[in-house]
Amino acid sequence: RIRYKGIVCDRCGVEVTSSKVRRERMGHIELAAPVTHIWYFKGIPSRMGLVLDMSPRSLEEIIYFASYVVIEPGDAPVEKKQMVTEREYRQLKKEYGAGFKAGMGAEAIKELLANVDLAGERDELKRELQEATGQKRVRAVRRLDIVEAFLQSDNKPEWMVMDVVPVIPPDLRPMVQLEGGRFATSDLNDLYRRVINRNNRLKRLLDLNAPGIIVQNEKRMLQEAVDALIDNGRRGRPVAGPGNRPLKSLSHMLKGKQGRFRQNLLGKRVDYSGRSVIDVGPFLKMNQMGLPVPMAIELFRPFIMKELTTRKLAGNVKSAKRKIDKADGDVMDVLEDVIKEHPVLLNRAPTLHRLGIQAFEPVLVSGKAMRLHPLVTEAYNADFDGDQMAIHVPLSDEAQAEARLLMLAAGHILAPKDGKPIVAPSQDMVIGNYYLTTEEAGREGEGMIFSGVDEARIAFARKVVHYHTRVGIQTSSFPAEKPFTDEQRSKVMVTSVGKLIFNEILPTDFPFINEPSEDNFKGVDDRFFIESGEDIHDYLAETPIIGAFKKGFLSDIIAEVYKRYKVTETSLLLDRMKDLGYEKSTESGLTVAMTDVTDLKEKPAILEDAHNQVATVTKQFRRGLITDDERYQRVTEIWTKAKDIIQDKLIESFEPTNPIFMMQDSGARGNISNFVQLAGMRGLMAGPGGKIIELPVTANFREGLTVMEMFISTHGARKGMSDTALKTANSGYLTRRLVDVAQDVIVREFDNDSDRGVAVKAIMDGTSVVEPLYDRILGRYAMKSVFDPETGEKIVSRNEMIDEDVAKAIVNAGIEEVTIRSVFTSTTEHGVSVLDYGRNLASGEEVEVGEAVGTVAAQSIGEPGTQLTMRNFHTGGVAGGNDITQGLPRVQEIVEARIPKGRAEISEVTGVVTAIEENPAERTKAVTIEGETDTRTYTLPLTARMRFAEGDEIQRGDAINEGPIDPKELLAVTDTLTTESYMLTEIQK
């Protein structure tokens, strides 16, 4: 029974009802004059303009009362829809009175729209389409589209003009009282208020029969008020509120990232989720995360309540709830069981690729920070300097199963973008394994021979040997599964104590790893074995020291283990490698002191030499022998060279045991340029305009910079910071557009019998190899059988996967070009086939039907986008070198098929370059190409760098000079395949 049923409010005469109608009851404003809807008038293309076949500009003049439009010409010498000025209108009205009719404002537009005969227009347009070409045709097609749409939807064109404005419910445009008696209100209320005020004033003026010009002005103001309400700022200056801030109109409420759709409908906040700071959890297994107890209680609350009631620890749900709030002892007992086997999802923003969300099994930890496994930080691009992550609980059984099967972190060892391991040890773990596998000549106990690994461990524990000691071990002591040859098993293997310990973490039947080379994966090289009884000291005296295992090699080991043993074994190995690394890096006691930053004796001499060279160049400039540009170019070259010399000398002077060198050499942290800045010189700095300042910073951080040097350095540092902020936004937007176009490319079938493929060869940039042939064919299917050119034997047959061995064989046979199945030539409807796509990089297996490869590709281009800098790069300081757009802007340029900056001319014919004539007066040169049928001449700027000389043969579609090609031109001259291949090549650079 509703208490207030049927009662009517005595103040306002509205029936009393529940307050939620404030969110659903609309009102409306009846306008005293019609008003056009700005979306239909200003949207691109202007829908009103298309229906009436008038330009948006003339529409604007009519709507905002600047000119009259003829509605009925009568006998007057004017056309229908012609624009006339005020003066002309009065003249015509006087002369042709009765039949002549013209008007202005939305009323006139409404009448014109009402007069449109849609069916007639449609037939007219269809006739026109048969002969029209070019722009006319495009316009006709657009008009036909809209006319058809009106006919099919039964909407009338005159409805684009409004007589009534709807008012949204009051709770959707709230007004709240602030402290101090002021009110805060939604912008919409202001906008509605302006409409109401102007509308009422217009009504009053009409009742008073005010002069036409005043009414006209008021109608225009009403039109503008309604425009601002619907889409503020679309036309003219936006209406501003207090503090000159543009008011948010109805359109803005829906638009963009902060609008209704993306913010609240696609991006809701969800229940059973939380976020917290992350911290490192070295004690975790690969598929675990540490969940703080207070978070766990909150996230799993309904599960705990259910469990408490089923175990009869609480009488009903309400008492269970009370128990949880009191943090009863029972709750903790139940919690352990509830979270067991219940995976949770962890996400770190920005989620750049699919590894930004992974599933883990929670383990309860104390404190308030979530603990993350150190190896997955790479995939999340997370660090522990205060990063936060979000956690989500999958509720239904299906969701849990999906998280467990598809998203467990242990299964995501390879990155989907290139198939290389993304969970590789970093920092401490790297330095630990590096330290462990280092060898040193002459350490204590060198040349001892052990009967087995355990004996070596005992010797180490008793301080007889060190990890770095080079020792021998009887090969026969290894388990039978270890791949040694029979000959090797009868000998003694020379290795180091640390390597014996390192190899214990590898699978039993994995080869013993004794040197950081890929060949070692096939088995240990015979050169590490000596006969039992041979003197090991002689052997050690002659044999050079083997390098330690660096970060890249650890990654190779992981990839190899993954290839052989798949997920489970690899994740176990990763955990063992992590624990070993942490343990040994702790034992190594690696420290850094000021004394580790060594002084370079030769530095003053190198600097003096450079200063002298600069003085010489300056002298030449003063005498007028060289231009200012040349002087600047040479000075910067001299200093760059000086810095390089210092860098080389520094590397020579390093002790291999220098901790800073070890950090950098192992790949744990830092690179050579950090070190050069500490111990060498900082070198040339970029100025505020991006131009290099020719005064170098000769000091390093150890000596300390002068005030002047410090000041010069700040430009570059500041630019770096602002670049980073800008490029993140750009890259995110690029990824979003890429995903948008590629998301429906899915693997639909196994094979589509396509008879076309793509011939691939190594991608070159000038003379340097960007991507070798091996990388391009690996994991793809051959289109044609490939034969060895020497022996003629078949290496791979058609539609067979090219795996590592086949790819090596092809490269070793000296074959430079292979035709492979490709997604470019796929004939599958709405997607691609398994044979076209090849191997799924994330799993190393052939791709499954149903894999969303388009999205994976989009994310793989978008994710490194953040790493690409915004910088535009000068070509090695060569005067006249074109400014080549690099990094992110270049990728965007390719993807959007824009006309690139500094583009190259391309040849439209295949033939021979017959002449290159320079014309200094116009700063151009003409290149003539003689084809089989016709001859073409191209005009290039004088400074353009040529790719062909006279007499060279040229193919159609080749660039004549250096620079990027415009993809649209290339497409016109050649076929889709060439263009696709060109775009692919460019992006890979």
Curated annotation (Swiss-Prot):
Entry keyword Transferase: yes
Coiled coil: none
Keyword list, A-Z: DNA-directed RNA polymerase, Magnesium, Metal-binding, Nucleotidyltransferase, Transcription, Transferase
Gene Ontology process terms (BP): DNA-templated transcription
Cofactor(s) the protein needs: Mg(2+)
Binding site for Mg(2+): D383, D385, D387
Cofactor, free-text remark: Binds 1 Mg(2+) ion per subunit.
GO cellular component: DNA-directed RNA polymerase complex
Reaction catalysis annotation: RNA(n) + a ribonucleoside 5'-triphosphate = RNA(n+1) + diphosphate
Pfam families tied to this protein: RNA_pol_Rpb1_1, RNA_pol_Rpb1_2, RNA_pol_Rpb1_3, RNA_pol_Rpb1_4, RNA_pol_Rpb1_5
InterPro entries according to UniProt: DNA-dir_RpoC_beta_prime, DNA-dir_RpoC_beta_prime_bact, RNA_pol_asu, RNA_pol_N, RNA_pol_Rpb1_1, RNA_pol_Rpb1_3, RNA_pol_Rpb1_3_sf, RNA_pol_Rpb1_4
Record-stated family: Belongs to the RNA polymerase beta' chain family.
Assembly with partners or alone: The RNAP catalytic core consists of 2 alpha, 1 beta, 1 beta' and 1 omega subunit. When a sigma factor is associated with the core the holoenzyme is formed, which can initiate transcription.
Record-linked PANTHER family: DNA-DIRECTED RNA POLYMERASE, DNA-DIRECTED RNA POLYMERASE SUBUNIT BETA
Free-text function comment from the UniProt entry: DNA-dependent RNA polymerase catalyzes the transcription of DNA into RNA using the four ribonucleoside triphosphates as substrates.
Protein name: DNA-directed RNA polymerase subunit beta'
UniProt source species: Leuconostoc pseudomesenteroides
Taxonomic placement: Bacteria, Bacillati, Bacillota, Bacilli, Lactobacillales
